[in-house]
Amino acid sequence: MVYSYSEKKRIRKDFGKRPQVLDIPYLLSIQLDSFKKFTDQDPTGERGFEAAFRSVFPIKSFSGNSELQYVSYKLGEPVFDVKECQIRGVTYSAPLRVKLRMVLYDREAAPGTVKDIKEQEVYMGDIPMMTDNGTFVINGTERVIVSQLHRSPGVFFDHDRGKTHSSGKVLYNARIIPYRGSWLDFEFDPKDALFVRIDRRRKLAASIILRALDYSTQDILDLFFDRVNFKIKKDSLVMDLVAERLRGETASYDIKDSEGSILVEKGRRITARHIRQLEKTNTTELEVPVDYISGKISGQDYIDPDTGEVLVSANAEISLEDLAKLSLAGIKEISTLYINELDNGAYMSDTLRIDSTTNRLEALVEIYRMMRPGEPPTKDAAEALFQNLFFSEERYDLSKVGRMKFNRRLSIDDDEGTGILSKEDIVAVMKNIITIRNGNDEVDDIDHLGNRRIRSVGEMAENQFRVGLVRVERAVRERLSLGDLNELMPQDLINAKPISAAVKEFFGSSQLSQFMDQNNPLSEVTHKRRISALGPGGLTRERAGFEVRDVHPTHYGRLCPIETPEGPNIGLINSLASFARTNSYGFLETPYRKVIDGVVTDQVDYLSAIEEGRYVIAQAIVDLDADGRMMDELIACRHKGDSTFMGAGDIQYMDVSPQQIISVAASLIPFLEHDDANRALMGANMQRQAVPTLKADKPLVGTGIERTLAVDSGVVVAAKRGGYVDYVDASRIVVKVNESELTPGEAGIDIYNLTKYTRSNQNTCINQRPCCSMGDPVVRGDVLADGPSTDLGDLALGQNMRIAFMPWNGYNFEDSILISERVAMEDRFTTIHIQELSCIARDTKLGSEEITADIPNVGESALSKLDESGIVYIGAEVKGGDILVGKVTPKGETQLTPEEKLLRAIFGEKASDVKDSSLRVPNSVKGTIIDVQVFTRDGVEKDKRAVEIEEMHVGQAKKDLSEEFQILEEGVYGRARNLLLNAGFTEDQLATIPRSQLLVQTIDDEAKQTELEQLAEQHDELKADFDKKFEIKRRKITQGDDLAPGVLKIVKVYLAVKRTIQPGDKMAGRHGNKGVISKINPVEDMPYDENGNPIDIVLNPLGVPSRMNIGQVLEVHMGAAAKGIGDRITAMLEEQRELAELRGYIKEVYELGEEVQQRVDIDSFTDDEVLRLAKNLKGGVPTATPAFDGAKEKEIKEMLALAGLPTSGQRRLFDGRTGDEFERQVTVGYMYMLKLNHLVDDKMHARSTGSYSLVTQQPLGGKAQFGGQRFGEMEVWALEAYGAAYTLQEMLTVKSDDVNGRTHMYKNIVDGNHQMQPGMPESFNVLLKEIRSLGINIELDQD
């Protein structure tokens, strides 16, 4: 493998044995691709805005004299960029403008004669736009739209598993689910009649819908039944024989062949052997006794030719009397329905008997009554209702997917078709459910991923947009029918509000539009790759059963079987597997390598769950020879959802990677294959809660996916193009681009501005730091700057800590964690949290609130940190209770004398009395002010601080743009110099020419002269562009802010809090091994090894065996080896050993291991590169052991030996307090530990007095309300059990809701009198009132 300059800085030693056939696809593509499809112009009109507009337009007036047609649309540019939107608290959106054409037809002339056409571009609201990282900024906060897994449209056959009826009989049902429109259900009842439901309303006989489709009884019988024909003879009947139909029947007469010999005696069961004999004798007719027909069902109406009387009606049972009547009427042949209890039930025949309707109109009326109970049905209304239900494109749409699923399920060859149902479709579904009831077909598995599809952002936004358009359509149609259209333009007809409202509602408050989890880069990526079965049109927690939540065989390579929440959402919220993607229909696909005759090729095919069932697929861990041929005779593989063994020749596909089945979070866990799945689930979930530490530390034991994840998450800055680093400081990186990657006429400079100390959604700190130096060569994709939780471009969620597995004085009882004071001293787990505190000045009835430093009754010291505008300085250290923004609010007016009123009226003083309503630092918070922002309403005078901030921002913007312009200008002049040198100018000549004159020189060579003129033009464009950009930026900064009604001013203060680690904080490893810190121990008391190196963290060994997460032990051993090798490299550097020796040792490290795919050619590195690599390896050699393909025990031992450590992974330890050696050797090594966002500071809370609930007068609950602790029934039982009567009385009265008692108590405590007088608890009064409200009076006797 060829490494770039920046990749050579630190190379992760990879133990992967399998070749990487396919790189992990871009992790955010599910979000970005979906939204791109929504916003991109689509000429076919199948998706996005285009599809929505075409489905609603043209809108015709009721009279048909005018219509509004859609021409085209375009999305404008967002007014503010993403960062500005976040600061201002507005939505990052672009205006949608649609070109509409209004056509007026001439009433007097021939139909279709156009009288007038008007075209106009109409504004149709703002559409939130997706940022480059797949998020939306809505009202200043970053949100993610989670993809939804819902039941695919189409037809599904299922049964109730015998749960509906007490007998346990299995009742089958079929359901046609459209993309939008009414659901159509068919179901059997316990008596085997077929019923239909529309939109889950009351059921009707299924034949009613057929009658409504204009089928007669005769048509229905012809559709669903075969016939048995009889010829009527004098004393017997002759039946047309289809031998196969006799199978399973008991012969009620002797069956003879054509020669008269008996084949089946009367009373015997007819078997397959008898049928073969009948077929051999070519018997086509069979004589049967007359009573054989009794009870059979007539296949048609039989009418007396003379009188016209119906002798036997269709679907009626034929009796012997009926037969006599038929023969009297001269009818010689009769046909009955072929019905067989085994595989041809009389279901439709039974249904027709239940059906009371006889013709189409009656059926339509019956359907109308069911859909609109209480409304009188008319013929037209009933017709229209039924037509609109399933046969109108406006009301019903199966969608492309639905039609494909429908046709495939019913074995119709063509995947294409209309979005509405046809008569044939409904009949085909009914025939299929009868086939299933007859036992000739299987029901569907609704949890199969071929029957569930993904609905992503773009599709959901399109649906919501269409909802808004439909609302507008109604209004437009009414307006087209009213008034004089000659005066109106399209703009006058369209009101954009309903569209904006629908879109805003979806992005702002839909269940699937979620506040982005921004703890760390992993949590961001995972949130964007989340697949939820909940939400509108999906399941609900309460109704979802075990089957839906369970792992299904089709999840393989599509949804992760590990990563899902614990709790009520388990299995309903899933994560996309690493390589999965959605196909054009929205079904999940996963990649496989093609196998031909036992040889694996490099051809990769993506298969959906439906397609996968047809193939035999081997796992990725199959042994292959050098040519890719499978070596084993029998190979473990999957076929139709089952695991089995097959020969190499039968294999058709093979997995692309062992990590294919798991999500990115699970594939970050090293030695995952050694962990129990439950613990792996916790490990995957807890990594998302890791707080970014002050200084990120790459994991020594990783899995090789860390870099991919960090780059794809967008928190690091990756180079867009190659070149070299021209300039670096803390907030900007400038890259001079390679000539080969430039587009003609471009300056050739890429500028990357870094994000500094901004607040994330979870109040953690987002900060980017450059990790390149000036002059460094850069390749496209190289990491230039690290973000939160990344280290040299690798994801780094925690810290590598020195671990020992041993008990220590009970401080690691029940998973507690004992840590060394050194960890806290070195700030290993110190995190920065940024809080945003807002102060809002409103216009009240009594006058305006004012932000000022002039606050009544506040001492000088409390105002010491405020400036003259009453706003805190940046850099001030503040603690709980300090004033951040001084604000005064007018008080309610006291009763004024007439004289005072007169003075008020003259001098216009609104309110002389004001009260202090300043913004203060919350209790228990201590930190530093890092930023202040002031937003002032348009038309309100800006205070001094706001003007200062504005000037600072304008200055900063000018500085940034000037520097950018200078760099670009320098690039232009540089190219001009090179051009002039090539054209014959000397260096001395150029030195005398002023820089501004370089671009106006004259050259003899015409081509070069043209090029120089182009550069001059480019320079002028750059200058004009700079002026324009600066003016736009300045206008944006200085314009007034669009604040909510009644708000005059908002001041936002950003407070950075530094949190060191302390007892009560929650920590975890990556294997689900979590615990709370019990004690921070002095370094001198910690156990230490023979070299005197103390342990950082002591974990309980009892936490390993029962949890079955052995991966953590292997990680500790591998970590020890990785750190040991780093220590040896450090020693070599300190001893200044020969470079060849160092190079040899590093080479030995990277070449260790059997069949390892990674090849690092250390010999090709320059001496400087080797030294830089060695310096970066001093802290330990980072290793990668990919899931299911990681390091073997033997390789770990070899690594330990190479580090000069005991291969057992255990060492002697000594007690830090006594110096004595511990009894036995202890497992010591390095484990990657995370500090989770469950900090004791956020949870610790105590209350003396505070707010009370209005009705019960009990204290509120929770830290946010400054509430109390609930003293529940079990706690009451405990006090009762101990007989602590007075404590119990105190808890239930004065400490809770005895209003008078607690007031007295407070007085008594102040007076030093420690007694209490408990009274009546308020909740008892509430109970009395509740009972009285039921009409029962209770009065209490006073003693």
Swiss-Prot record:
InterPro entries: DNA-dir_RNA_pol_bsu_external_1 (IPR019462), DNA-dir_RNA_pol_su2 (IPR015712), DNA-dir_RNAP_su2_dom (IPR007120), DNA-dir_RNAP_su2_hyb_sf (IPR037033), RNA_pol_bsu_bac (IPR010243), RNA_pol_bsu_CS (IPR007121), RNA_pol_bsu_protrusion (IPR007644), RNA_pol_Rpb2_2 (IPR007642). PROSITE patterns: RNA_POL_BETA. GO terms for molecular function: DNA binding; DNA-directed RNA polymerase activity; ribonucleoside binding. Its EC number is 2.7.7.6. Keywords: DNA-directed RNA polymerase, Nucleotidyltransferase, Transcription, Transferase. One of its GO terms (biological process) is DNA-templated transcription. It catalyses: RNA(n) + a ribonucleoside 5'-triphosphate = RNA(n+1) + diphosphate. It comes from the Bacteria. GO terms for cellular component: DNA-directed RNA polymerase complex. CDD domains: RNA_pol_B_RPB2 (cd00653). NCBIfam families: PRK00405.1, rpoB. Belongs to the RNA polymerase beta chain family. DNA-dependent RNA polymerase catalyzes the transcription of DNA into RNA using the four ribonucleoside triphosphates as substrates. The RNAP catalytic core consists of 2 alpha, 1 beta, 1 beta' and 1 omega subunit. When a sigma factor is associated with the core the holoenzyme is formed, which can initiate transcription. This is DNA-directed RNA polymerase subunit beta. The lineage of its organism: Bacteria, Pseudomonadati, Pseudomonadota, Gammaproteobacteria, Alteromonadales.
